Amino acid sequence: MSAITITEAAQAYLAELLEKQSTPGIGIRIFITQPGTQYAETCIAYCKPGEEKVEDTAIALKDFTAWIDAVSEPFLEDAVVDYATDRMGGQLTIKAPNAKVPMVNEDSPITERINYYLQTEINPGLASHGGQVSLVDVVEDNIAVLRFGGGCQGCGMVDMTLKDGVEKTLIERIPELKGVRDVTDHSNKENAYY
């Protein structure tokens, strides 16, 4: 069973749209273009009988079937399709919090794993100070070269953040990583948090 939720309001709205198509057995197909990247977009399309793919997961709903694209399915974990009414009519919304999160495991290249932990664990904390960190490269001896930006650039606490936060977290998650190096120009203190 897929971990996507399609609310009753969304089901009713979609059933109404599908009925207007005058195609017996028509359903919807939910997929993500460029899943696991910053360009990911969650999509819903009509799916006539026979247009679904063998590897798709079928969700039998009250009035129609929703087909979930197999490649997109892990990225649709915790996704919610909803329909909210307002003065102007209503709007179908799709919230897919994992659409842009890359799927990694211990066999993934070290750069993918570093980027994954930067985006999912480290940057959310730095964002509270208006900052972020990105991977520039992985150099000899498995040293990650990083660049800070936003409120972290020029910040007086960046050395502590680098060693006690970023480096510690990355080495705990990626044992073959031996350390991190900062290549940020911290002389620009215009947006610095501290």
From Swiss-Prot:
A Gene Ontology molecular function term of the record: iron ion binding
Superkingdom of origin: Bacteria
Cofactor mode of binding and number, as noted: Binds 1 [4Fe-4S] cluster per subunit. The cluster is presumably bound at the interface of two monomers.
Record protein name field: Fe/S biogenesis protein NfuA
Function in brief: Involved in iron-sulfur cluster biogenesis. Binds a 4Fe-4S cluster, can transfer this cluster to apoproteins, and thereby intervenes in the maturation of Fe/S proteins. Could also act as a scaffold/chaperone for damaged Fe/S proteins.
Cofactor needs: [4Fe-4S] cluster
Alphabetized Gene3D superfamilies for the sequence: Fe-S cluster assembly (FSCA), HesB-like domain
HAMAP family attached to this UniProt entry: Fe_S_biogen_NfuA
UniProt binding sites for [4Fe-4S] cluster: 152, 155
GO BP term (any one): iron-sulfur cluster assembly
Family: Belongs to the NfuA family.
Keywords: 4Fe-4S, Iron, Iron-sulfur, Metal-binding
Disulphide bond pairs: none
Subunit structure: Homodimer.
